[in-house]
Amino acid sequence: LDAWGGPVGRHAAVGRQRFWTPLRLIMLFAVIFLAFGFFSKAGCLETTHPTDGSQPGLLWDGRQYYKACYADPLPLYSIEGLSKGAFPYKYSWTTETGEERFMEYPVLSGMFQYVTAQGAQAWQAVFPGGPIEVVKYFVLGAVLLAILWMVAVWATYRSAGRRPWDTLLMAASPLVIFQAFTNYDLLAIAFASVALLLWARRRPVWAGVVLGLGVAA
């Protein structure tokens, strides 16, 4: 931060701002970079509108590569049976080589996907217009993941002690733009961040419980 305004002088009034506290500024940066992350996936949310009466679907045609917008939730919504309301780990499918496959995610990540799918299908039933179901699934999941990331940033800030601005390196990381909504890693990151905070507050039992949930995510 010294590069922006130089070092703090002897007569500087530090900590006098009532609204724009360090935490709120860091959270603002977190929201901005999450928004960039969501819009980086917009190219893969474009939908076809066929004229032959068939159902609209995602218009990918290789754009997940040349627009760098690939996100696992979009293809896995149908591959893993979530679009059919199938329960994770009970549903299986057969690959082109004849191999039987099941959902490969840890338990909490699998349940996160299932709950998100149920929410998207309820959204589709109540409001059938607008985006197609898989897009609603992605949007709902992105909102939940964004909340989890905010929790992770908050926990890291609380753990930073006398160096709260170090958390800005996390909130404003370019990796957020490209990876926040590519998969479900933010679920485990949120649990790990809270576990570290609990450990720093000398609550080892709860830290172990939350860290265990992170491992299951």
Give each language-model segment a name.
Residues L1-G161:
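TM-lumen/periplasm interface segments of multi-pass membrane proteins
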Residues W154-S173, W206:
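Transmembrane-helix signature of polytopic, membrane-embedded enzymes
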Residues A155, P174-L175, A188-W206:
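Specific aromatic-rich, kink-prone transmembrane helix
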Residues A180-A188:
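Short acidic/glycine- and proline-prone juxtamembrane loop motifs at membrane-interface regions
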Residues G98, L175-I177, V210:
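Alpha-helical hydrophobic/aromatic positions enriched in membrane-embedded helices and signal peptides
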Residues W206-A217:
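Voltage-sensor/pore transmembrane module of 6-TM cation channels
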Residues F102-M103, L169, F181, G214-V215:
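Residue-level signal for helical boundary/lining positions with a hydrophobic bias
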